[in-house]
UniProtKB/Swiss-Prot annotation:
Source organism of this protein record: Katsuwonus pelamis (Skipjack tuna)
Binding of nitrite, residues: 59
Quaternary organization: Monomeric.
Name of the protein: Myoglobin
GO BP annotations, alphabetical order: removal of superoxide radicals
Amino-acid positions noted as binding heme b in the UniProt annotation, renumbered to this chain: 88
Reaction(s) catalysed by this chain's protein: Fe(III)-heme b-[protein] + nitric oxide + H2O = Fe(II)-heme b-[protein] + nitrite + 2 H(+); H2O2 + AH2 = A + 2 H2O
Annotated ranges, domain Globin: 2-140
Gene for this chain: mb
Main location, first listed in the record: cytoplasm
Entry's EC annotation: 1.7.-.-, 1.11.1.-
Protein's job: Monomeric heme protein which primary function is to store oxygen and facilitate its diffusion within muscle tissues. Reversibly binds oxygen through a pentacoordinated heme iron and enables its timely and efficient release as needed during periods of heightened demand. Depending on the oxidative conditions of tissues and cells, and in addition to its ability to bind oxygen, it also has a nitrite reductase activity whereby it regulates the production of bioactive nitric oxide.
InterPro entries in the record: Globin (IPR000971), Globin-like_sf (IPR009050), Myoglobin (IPR002335)
Length: 146
């Protein structure tokens, strides 16, 4: 619970500007792992200022709002995880490793924009590790090994 509290302490900076932070997180993900951009067909041709692209920022905001919902559930997130896993496995076909990659992008952006220190970044990785493990368990139930 201490890890979750550490992450939630800086979450206000995310909520203050979901679009900007979301755009930065996805831009960081695509920069560090260019292959991930191909998983988002509507972003495939976007180059240049990815973070400033309205569609990328809007999708990043959607991702962060859902993550905020998961965080605020404080571990009681089965009802949130199940449909998320279902859509990401069946519809979007997102390999589980990509959730680890976006966690690293988020840690980097939160360090820069919200002052998340090394301990906070470790807390974020720990919290996301639990979320990702639960997503992966749902993926397995669905027979998705991506």
């Amino acid at each position: 619970m201490a890890d979750l509290d550490a992450v939630l302490k800086c979450w206000g900076a995310v909520e203050a500007d979901f679009n900007t932070v979301g755009g930065l997180v996805l831009a960081r993900l695509f920069k560090d792992h260019p292959e991930t951009q191909k998983l988002f067909p509507k972003f495939a041709g976007i180059t240049g200022d990815i973070a400033g692209n309205a569609a990328v920022a809007a999708h990043g905001a959607t991702v962060l709002k859902k993550l905020g919902e998961l965080l605020k559930a404080k571990g009681n997130h089965a009802a949130i995880i199940k449909p998320l896993a279902n859509s990401h496995a069946k519809q979007h076909k997102i390999p589980i490793n990509n959730f680890k990659l976006i966690t690293e992008a988020l840690a980097h952006v939160l360090h820069e924009k919200a002052g998340l220190d090394a301990a906070g970044q470790t807390a974020l990785r720990n919290v996301m590790g639990i979320v990702i493990a639960d997503l992966e368990a749902n993926y397995k139930e669905l027979g998705f090994t991506g």
